[in-house]
Regions:
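A short, basic N-terminal segment
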Residues: 1-52, 72-91
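Short secondary-structure boundary/capping segments
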Residues: 69-72, 113-114, 209-211, 247-254, ...
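P-loop NTPase nucleotide-binding core
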Residues: 6-9, 50-51, 56-192, 201-207, ...
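The catalytic "switch" region of P-loop NTPases
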Residues: 198-330
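Short, hydrophobic/amphipathic alpha-helical patches that form generic packing surfaces
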Residues: 68-71, 123-138, 270-277, 355-362, ...
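Short linear interaction motifs
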Residues: 31-51, 172-175, 213-216, 252-253, ...
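C-terminal leucine-rich, beta-strand-based interaction scaffolds used for sensing/assembly
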Residues: 2-11, 226, 311-488
Length: 488
């Protein structure tokens, strides 16, 4: 390839800065979605008819997975990765949404929370049964239900009305679903009902969230063997699943057949390579001499088949250089990226690594330091980690844990240095929650720190002190002992 001019280098950086994170899968445009999407064997397992629970953090690719199956080419590629033939034929399958915060078809958080007050999980089983019927009724007629029950299946019908009608016509509701499952079985068809964003049904009230989720899990735990062709897919955040004791034996019945969406470094670099190479012809030309093994797959574009993490080293080093400075002691760029984007549990989200490359490219565009053929200077990469940190913490507050803003404000008031003695951090986390509208499930300093460690924000070192990964330093206003001074 001819040597790039400065203008072409600037164009390459501009393209990398727009490589396709768009903040979240929900906001990505349809055009070119499959060219950015990387189907994985784990995704195929999640579509297996026997898998009920899909565990993954926000940003781990759950939404992308179910967006991909809306495209025939996407579903077909995912099915090719399946082992054992557990993924049903897409032409004989319907995928419905059992709960989502999008649109007006499902109860808003405040309504759900208010309804669940004073209720037991057994009560919530009835409301989830009603919502299942409502979901099915939108796309097909539900046979032999009383007129009063059908009226309650309208999205405009209040939850208390739906609850009361299900109570009154419980046998008819189950009989109708039994008949539907029989019809599906005779015609060799499937209906999958998906439940996502469940943490938002009562994001600000942990007690109500427990009750609501227990109702859903108990309902499907009791009925997943009753219906062979009417199948649920329940997406749970990892921290909710890890608190499995809160759900008792109900989860254990369905947890044996579960899929966990975990991204290995190989898969993260494969995703990055696919997005970069398929984004623009100029980027493909830039990486042409160092591209890992791959093949063209129709609407998916170029698909990386190189099996090991090491296979992607040359591609990353062409863009980022070999070292994070002038000397090897500064660390190798290839391993530095994943190490500095991981949380306290050792996990890296695909959303984070895409934002990292976008951010580093934008920073480099504003102040070019890298020498050709390198595009990203190590200072731009370090600054990009801070950007990812801020956006990740903001995302946690906005989409996952509204109470995390209080934790952030508390830490930013003192900028504690890590590593820190556990008792000292527990003392800092003694917060008066009495006036807070949204509270964490654990409010003592000890309990809150334990929760933050479960979430990967902090982790326990071998010497007993508490530390935080770089992913959360800037976002929470933390400082690292012996590290570069931060201008807080």
């Amino acid at each position: 390839m001819a040597k790039l001019t400065k203008e072409e280098a600037d164009k390459l950086l501009e393209l990398i800065s727009q490589m396709g994170s768009y903040g979240s899968a929900e906001s990505e445009p349809d055009a070119g979605f499959l060219r950015r999407y990387l189907p994985l064997p784990e995704h195929a397992r999640a579509l297996d008819s026997q898998v009920i629970l899909v565990i993954g953090d926000r940003g781990a690719g759950k939404t992308e997975l179910f967006r991909a199956i809306q495209f025939p080419a996407g579903l077909q590629q995912i099915r090719k990765l399946a082992k054992g033939g557990g993924v049903p034929d897409p032409s004989h399958s319907a995928w419905l949404v059992g709960y989502s915060t999008s649109g007006t078809e499902y109860p808003p958080e405040l309504v759900f929370r208010e309804f669940s007050k004073g209720k037991q999980p057994t009560d919530l089983q009835l409301i989830w049964l009603g919502l299942l019927l409502r979901c099915l009724h939108r796309v097909r007629s539900i046979a032999d239900l009383p007129e009063a029950m059908l009226d309650a299946l309208s999205p405009e019908s209040p939850l208390p009305v739906l609850f009361n009608r299900v109570q009154q016509h419980l046998e008819s509701c189950f009989a109708s679903l039994n008949r539907l499952d029989g019809e599906l079985d005779r015609s060799s068809k499937w209906i999958f009902v998906t439940y996502d964003e469940l943490d938002r049904v009562s994001a600000g009230d942990w007690d109500q969230l427990k009750t609501i989720l227990r109702g859903l899990v108990q309902f499907w735990s009791s009925n997943c063997r009753r219906w062979r062709r009417l199948r649920p897919k329940i997406f749970l955040r990892r921290d909710l699943f890890n608190r499995v004791a809160l759900f008792g034996p109900d989860v254990s019945k369905i947890a044996a057949q579960r899929v966990e969406l975990v991204w290995t470094p190989r898969n993260l670099y494969a995703l990055s390579a696919k997005r970069l190479v398929n984004h623009d012809l100029l980027l493909r030309q830039y990486f042409e001499s160092v591209m890992p093994g791959g093949e063209e797959r129709g609407e998916l574009g170029w698909y990386p088949t190189a099996a090991t993490e090491e296979d992607y080293r040359k591609l990353i080093e062409r863009m980022c250089g070999k070292y994070m400075g002038a000397e090897p002691q500064k660390g190798q760029s290839f391993t530095w990226i994943a190490n500095h984007l991981q949380d306290g549990n050792g996990q890296v989200l695909p959303r984070s690594i895409v934002r990292f490359f976008e951010g580093a490219a934008e920073i480099e565009r504003q102040n070019r330091k890298a020498e050709w053929p390198r595009l990203l200077h190590h200072t731009s990469m370090r600054a990009a980690v801070d950007q990812v940190s801020v956006s990740r913490v903001q995302e946690i507050e906005d989409e996952e844990f509204p109470w995390m803003k209080t934790v952030r404000n508390t830490l930013q008031a003192t900028h504690p240095q890590v590593p820190i003695e556990r008792r000292d951090l527990e003392y800092l986390l003694v917060i008066d929650w009495s006036r807070a509208s949204e509270k964490p499930p654990e409010t003592s300093g000890h309990g809150l720190l334990q929760l933050l460690m479960e979430l990967g924000i902090f982790y326990l070192r071998g010497d007993g002190r508490v530390d935080a990964r770089d992913l959360y330093l800037k976002g929470f206003g933390l400082k690292r002992r012996g590290g570069v001074a931060r201008p807080y």
